[in-house]
Amino acid sequence: MADEQFPAAATALEEYQSIEEQMASPEVVSNPDKLRKLGRRHAELGAIVGAYKTWLQVKDDLAAAQEMAGEDADFAEEAKRLEAELPGVEEKLRTALIPRDPDDARDTIMEIKAGTGGEEAALFAGDLLRMYTRYAEKRGWSVNVQSENTTELGGVKDVQIAIRAKGTPAPEDGVWASMKYEGGVHRVQRIPVTESQGRIQTSAAGVIVFPEADEDDDEIEIDPKDLKIDIFMSSGPGGQSVNTTYSAVRMTHLPTGITVNMQDEKSQIQNRAAALRVLKSRLLAMKHEQEAAEAADMRHSQVRSLDRSERIRTYNFPENRIVDHRTNYKAYNLDAVLDGDLQAVIDSDIQADEADRLANQQ
């Protein structure tokens, strides 16, 4: 049988068809959370199923052409063409079967923190926030600022945002599939606006990213007894009050010590719900890290401290140059990158990751 060569693909096809049946049932259609989860898995299997069906078709067509080749020169020619095409089709299927990051289709929580460099580092953190916001807009994603502390000069001390796709994207088009490579220390070299001598200064900002958990994510269960919740007044630039009510929330998960601050929603209830979702996302990331402790997952390559030596990328303004130190990607279009033209940089990381996964499969 055809599926004996790729049993994993045959199993994926069966699951894919089963999910399609479930998604058509009234019970699932009326449950958005269930529909979203099934849709994510459906999209994840789609690439495998598509490659598998193509392989089956080429195999069947080749067998038919070979059977008729002795009687018809056209079939003989077709058999040669299909025989040459088959290895490439098989390779695409093998690649599709390489396990993806199960979180690729998820949305993403991102934190940007000013590091060494004082006010200049805060201004650069603001530049990164604008860069990611504009990149998200180009991808058709939404950006929701969940908490933000700014400086009097318009810099960003720290900010937390949620980047979300519309609908249920295929894993390769998910927010996490691209944004997971942004975690680490980003270094900037430029003449600060506060520098009167025209000297180039080096400063840094740290970026931490983790996949966003679903509101009803059953992978993570939080006991209310494990939560400490503090309520305080929201504050803006320079400590100014955002509103006159105590609506901001600080949520601490006692077993792990993880703390989440949320103040940008309109009410305390909304801030509590948003904080809980971010906390679940952090715990989900921690769980996945523990499960993949032997592999180089996202947290292993992210910020351990905001020291400039742990850089993953350098933004050199005098030369209009950007360098990704993990892939040796280099380009002289920094102005465009900061305006959201980030895809080529991210693609270099995706390609390096795919090459590593291919090598590990062999």
Curated annotation (Swiss-Prot):
Top-level taxon in the UniProt lineage: Bacteria
Localization: Cytoplasm
SMART domains, per database record: PCRF
SUPFAM superfamilies on file: Release factor
GO molecular function: translation release factor activity, codon specific
UniProt entry tagged with the keyword Flavoprotein: no
Residues the record lists as N5-methylglutamine modifications: 240
Post-translational modification: Methylated by PrmC. Methylation increases the termination efficiency of RF1.
The name this protein goes by in its record: Peptide chain release factor 1
Assigned GO CC terms: cytoplasm
Protein function: Peptide chain release factor 1 directs the termination of translation in response to the peptide chain termination codons UAG and UAA.
Keyword annotations from UniProtKB, A to Z: Cytoplasm, Methylation, Protein biosynthesis
UniProt-listed Pfam families: PCRF (PF03462), RF-1 (PF00472)
Similarity section: Belongs to the prokaryotic/mitochondrial release factor family.
Chief place where the protein resides: cytoplasm
InterPro entries noted in UniProt: PCRF, Pep_chain_release_fac_I, Pep_chain_release_fac_I_sf, Prokaryotic/Mito_RF, RF-1
